[in-house]
Amino acid sequence: MKTGSLTPYDIVNTIIRNRGGMASSERKVLDATWNALENYVTSDNTLVVVDGSGSMYGGSSVKPVAVAESLGIYFAERNKGAFRNHFITFSTNPQLVEIKGRDIFEKALYCMSYNECSNTNIEKTFDLILNTAVKNRLKQSDMPSRLIIISDMEFDIA
């Protein structure tokens, strides 16, 4: 399947618009499309901080939350080690969330269950990453080399 013209958010935006239910055949097509997306990721870990607040659901075509959730999942699936299949919530009390689900539909819905309306404490976000590294005895090379924050909200003063 050629997915060169599709982006991760195209797929997740479809899920958001149909989160009340989707036929099994449609879910299979979305999952196959998701799995066929090109890999633009280097070998470095990239951790995404995902804002899922209500304001991210605005807009008439592609919703900002679709961009945040899709890139959170996209990079998480390509990470290695302790950060594989994880993203961080955009929150006053951020969480490192392990993504669960059998297909992209379930994964997107699972990630959306962590949505909250909050600003973020960036210092706590970095503490969370550091504590995860210490707990898992990670080497420097296993740490995320990039942190991407996708939000339309505000940051607390660090």
Q: Where are the regions a protein language model picked out?
A:
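Acidic, glycine-rich A-domain
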Residues: M1-A158
